[in-house]
Amino acid sequence: MKPSLKVGLTFEFSYKVPENKTVPFLFPEASEFQKMPDVLATGYMVGLVEWACIDAINPHLDWPREQSVGVLVNLDHTAATPPGFTVTIKGTVTAVEGRKLTFSIEADDGVDRISRGTHQRYVIDAERFNQSVTEKIAKIRA
């Protein structure tokens, strides 16, 4: 991690919601989802918040050797966003505790605030992390 990654870092990230990021597309094999409204799925919104945070911190990491993984999501989802709307995420790094980063997040779709909350990420060494995943897979196959 570079010294530039510190509390107070702010960022903004925008994304135009396509049809394939709506609830029916979240788990196509789940018939229940197929009957639900065509609005941004909460699962995709969480992924969008993760993407915004990754995009904000990557210039402050030794990318791609250093990467980050999500370890906590505490977000509400208070308004529906139809396809074609642009979601804008505004965030601030509120804590840097070793390799653990905490973000304050707010998202809106140009009409409503759709989310507010916090997200935490942990900075990892990608090679070491991938090795531990490989070892875990080997345990299940043994």
Regions found by a protein language model. Name each.
Residues 12-18, 76, 120-122:
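Generic structural detector for well-ordered beta-strands
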Residues 2-40:
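Catalytic strand-loop segment that frames the active site of acyl-thioester-processing enzymes
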Residues 53-88:
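Hydrophobic beta-strand-centered segment that forms part of the acyl-chain substrate-binding groove
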Residues 92-142:
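HotDog/MaoC-like acyl-thioester-processing domains
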